[in-house]
């Protein structure tokens, strides 16, 4: 692994105060330069001070040119990072030690320092205190030139973020994409910490064979890396979880002041590693195979509601591993006390990071869902304001959401579990409910209907039961159909008996014997019964069952309103042998239509209503 010298160069930000008497051409050169970020950068250009950056870029370019000249190593590795400190802007310049020994480093740096003053500052030395200095092994006199290895970059420089981080340059292949990309920086830092933790784990010394918890050792770095690795494996993100997992380990790290200071930093680093390198199945799937799953509470709830536990477990496992693509959500639907919240709560608390949807805050409903392993939507409703973002999240798409008092953040594909006793596919907009998004929402969900109420002493699902259930699912995977409603039953057909097991059927007793065909009554043809037929049976010559509409049309009061006659041949055709009788009525009063037309109709229902005779009413008192 190559070694690097570190030179810290302070950059003037106040030209009048730090460079008294500097020319106007220098000021114009600094002020006119405009910087733009490369396309692959996710940094905020508004947080970058462009005037000091112009000077810093010129300083690092001329410094590296002179370094290659004195070291006679044109391909020497370097990493330069420009930062905004509390008092001054400064650069960390890491240059490979190849070609320059420590005893002559001061001589060469003095020459480079003078070159920078003459070429860049026009002969005016900055008034910044100790503006050009090499890092020493210790402060004060007597310290040697410090040589750092490549781990210094991911340990100290890469974790820097804006606004402290301003810019970076390098010719090292592994860090080219991370110079101006904060996401790549986080990934490399997490990868480095994981690698170091695994290395320390492999080289454990004096480890207690009866416990996998870390203990205090003589080497601080080894102890710290061992601690971080153990926290990551156990999914511990807080001191409370640490105490619950291993109380002796937590107390041992609080015994000394130097180890006590590592607790918060170790938990923070472990959280970063877990969020970047781990997924939900790493903590949901148990390590040991399960022999008897029948006592598992999740198994009992699914079986109680008519689901095949093996098929349902495969749905849960595929959901956690994100193997169903767009169908990224499990919806547990049912009334209260059916176990839906019991299951969802246990799954959410088994992973180190889970987020809850705050559907009551329509402005920032997904504020808590960034960088999580599982998203839990508890007893909510789908509103018109959040439905589009919700469809993207439920479908496992990358989407940016607004956060309170922060800039928008991206939610990566994350498994979602929904619990509700209302229709989550109906979109509520004010006082109206629409179903235009019902099919897209159903295409993103697996729906479990839990309708059986649990006993009051059923108990809570534990983390270990969740891990055992997912482990059992992994060992008994079956093919899952991509459908909204998870099929129930799952009962397997019994195999057909062998020939030896088939016995002769018993003789039927005469008292319960079925009548023969000859004894059965002849079927009735209702087509002969109806003179008028409805539009459904108008062309039928054989009707095995009665029709309510045909019955109504063959009552005495049934008259064709269009032609004023019964048994209308045009509307309800019958055989030619049956005559059509026309019913003619005499009206004293006419309805307003026939009154205007001046024509007396043969039959009219409106005229019947005008000429009602109470003597003919069967309900007359």
UniProtKB/Swiss-Prot annotation:
Superkingdom as given in the UniProt entry: Viruses
Gene Ontology terms: biological process: DNA replication; symbiont-mediated arrest of host cell cycle during G2/M transition; symbiont-mediated perturbation of host cell cycle G1/S transition checkpoint; viral DNA genome replication
Matching SUPFAM superfamilies: Origin of replication-binding domain, RBD-like, P-loop containing nucleoside triphosphate hydrolases
Signal peptide boundaries: none
Sequence motif: RCR-3, positions: 156-160
Keyword Nucleotide-binding: yes
Residue ranges of the region described as Disordered: 196-216, 489-520
Keyword GTP-binding assigned: no
UniProt-listed Pfam families: Parvo_NS1, Rep_N
Record-level GO cellular component terms: host cell nucleus
SF3 helicase domain location: 308-463
UniProt-recorded name of the protein: Protein Rep78
Organism: Adeno-associated virus 2 (isolate Srivastava/1982) (AAV-2)
The encoding gene: Rep78
């Amino acid at each position: 692994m190559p070694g690097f010298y570190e030179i810290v160069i302070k950059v003037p930000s106040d030209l009048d105060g730090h460079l008294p008497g500097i020319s106007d051409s220098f000021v114009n050169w600094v002020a006119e330069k405009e910087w733009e970020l490369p396309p692959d950068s996710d940094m905020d250009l508004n947080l970058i001070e462009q005037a000091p950056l112009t000077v810093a870029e010129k300083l690092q370019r001329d410094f590296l040119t002179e370094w290659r000249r004195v070291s006679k190593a044109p391909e020497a590795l370097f990493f330069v990072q420009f930062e905004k400190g509390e008092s001054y802007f400064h650069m960390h310049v890491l240059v490979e030690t190849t070609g320059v020994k420590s005893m002559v480093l001061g001589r060469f740096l003095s020459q480079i320092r003078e070159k920078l003053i003459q070429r860049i500052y026009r002969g005016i030395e900055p008034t910044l205190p100790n503006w050009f200095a090499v890092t020493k092994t210790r402060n004060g006199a007597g310290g040697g030139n410090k040589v750092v290895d490549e781990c210094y970059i991911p340990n100290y420089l890469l974790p820097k973020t804006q606004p402290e981080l301003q810019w970076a340059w390098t010719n090292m292949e592994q860090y080219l994409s991370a110079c101006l990309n904060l996401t790549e920086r986080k990934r490399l830092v997490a990868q480095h910490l994981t690698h170091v933790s695994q290395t320390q784990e492999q080289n454990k010394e004096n480890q207690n064979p009866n416990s996998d918890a870390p203990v205090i050792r003589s080497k601080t770095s080894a102890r710290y890396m061992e601690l971080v690795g153990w926290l990551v494996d156990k999914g511990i993100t807080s001191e409370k979880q640490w105490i619950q997992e291993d109380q002796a380990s937590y107390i041992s790290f609080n015994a000394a002041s130097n180890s006590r200071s590592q607790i918060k930093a170790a938990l923070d680093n472990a959280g970063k590693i877990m969020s970047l390198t781990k997924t939900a199945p790493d903590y949901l799937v148990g390590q040991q195979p399960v022999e008897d799953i029948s006592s598992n509470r999740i198994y009992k709830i699914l079986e109680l509601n008519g689901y095949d536990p093996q098929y349902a477990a495969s749905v849960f496992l595929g959901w956690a591993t994100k193997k169903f693509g767009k169908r990224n959500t499990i919806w547990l639907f049912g009334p209260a006390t059916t176990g839906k919240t019991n299951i969802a709560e246990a799954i959410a608390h088994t992973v180190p990071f889970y987020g809850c949807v705050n559907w009551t805050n329509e402005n920032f409903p997904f504020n808590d869902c960034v960088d999580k392993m599982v998203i839990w939507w508890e007893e909510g409703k789908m509103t018109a304001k959040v439905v589009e973002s919700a469809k993207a999240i439920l479908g496992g798409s990358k989407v940016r959401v607004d956060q309170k008092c922060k800039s928008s953040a991206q939610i990566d594909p994350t498994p979602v579990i929904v619990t509700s006793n209302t229709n989550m596919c109906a979109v509520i907009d004010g006082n109206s409910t629409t179903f235009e998004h019902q099919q897209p929402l159903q295409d993103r969900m697996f729906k479990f209907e839990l309708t059986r109420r649990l006993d009051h002493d059923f108990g809570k699902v534990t983390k270990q039961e969740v891990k055992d259930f997912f482990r059992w699912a992994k060992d008994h995977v079956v093919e899952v159909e991509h459908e909204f409603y998870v099929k129930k039953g799952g009962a397997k057909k019994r195999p057909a008996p062998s020939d030896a097991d088939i016995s002769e059927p018993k003789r039927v007793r005469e008292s319960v014997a079925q009548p023969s065909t000859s004894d059965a009554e002849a079927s009735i043809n209702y087509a002969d019964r109806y003179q008028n037929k409805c539009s459904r049976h108008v062309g039928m010559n054989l009707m095995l069952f009665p029709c309510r509409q045909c019955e109504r049309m063959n009552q005495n009061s049934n008259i064709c309103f269009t032609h004023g006659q019964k048994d209308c041949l045009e509307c309800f055709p019958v055989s030619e042998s049956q005559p059509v009788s026309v019913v003619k009525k005499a009206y004293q009063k006419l309805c307003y239509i026939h009154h205007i037309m001046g024509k007396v109709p043969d039959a009219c229902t409106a005229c019947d209503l005008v000429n009602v005779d109470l003597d003919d009413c069967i309900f007359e008192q």
